């Protein structure tokens, strides 16, 4: 039977490898993959009200002109089917199955060896 310190060492190695692997995988994803970006998109400015003196003496309610009849739209041509895109290359430093599974395998081997 192995001494108690060997069991504690195995558990410590397991925990260290586990946290290192999970931390590496989370850091490799990066904040841009989670939609956290600096600045916002689509935030327009609010409109300003026009005062009575800004109308330049024009009639505020002009009579609407009759709408012309819409021309018939030509039939759209069928678009050719797009070619399938090749799989993108993984980014350098991105988490892969190998980079995540390796710490688990090392930790499991350490636990098995200790017991």
UniProtKB/Swiss-Prot annotation:
Keyword field: Cell membrane, Glycoprotein, GPI-anchor, Lipoprotein, Membrane, Repeat, Signal
Q: Mark which residues the record calls propeptide.
A: 94-115
List the subcellular locations: Cell membrane
Stretches with biased composition (Basic and acidic residues): 31-52
Bilayer disposition of the protein? Lipid-anchor; GPI-anchor
List the GPI-anchor amidated glycine lipid attachment residues.
93
Checking Pfam families in the record gives: Trypan_PARP
Which residue windows does the record flag with biased composition (Acidic residues)? 60-90
Its Gene Ontology cellular component terms are: plasma membrane; side of membrane
Positions annotated as glycosylated:
56
Q: Give the function comment from the record.
A: Major surface antigen of procyclic forms.
Designated name of the protein: Procyclic form-specific polypeptide
Lineage of the species this protein comes from: Eukaryota, Discoba, Euglenozoa, Kinetoplastea, Metakinetoplastina
């Amino acid at each position: 039977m192995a001494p108690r310190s060997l069991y504690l060492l195995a558990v410590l190695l397991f925990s260290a490898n586990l946290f290192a692997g999970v931390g590496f995988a989370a850091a490799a994803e990066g904040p841009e993959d989670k939609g956290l970006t600096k600045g916002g998109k689509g935030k327009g400015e609010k409109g300003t009200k026009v005062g009575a003196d800004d109308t330049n003496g024009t009639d505020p309610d002009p009579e609407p002109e009759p709408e012309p009849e819409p021309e018939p739209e030509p039939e759209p041509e069928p678009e050719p089917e797009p070619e399938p895109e090749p799989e993108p290359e993984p980014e350098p430093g991105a988490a892969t199955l190998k980079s995540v599974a390796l710490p688990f395998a090392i930790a499991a081997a350490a636990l098995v060896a200790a017991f």
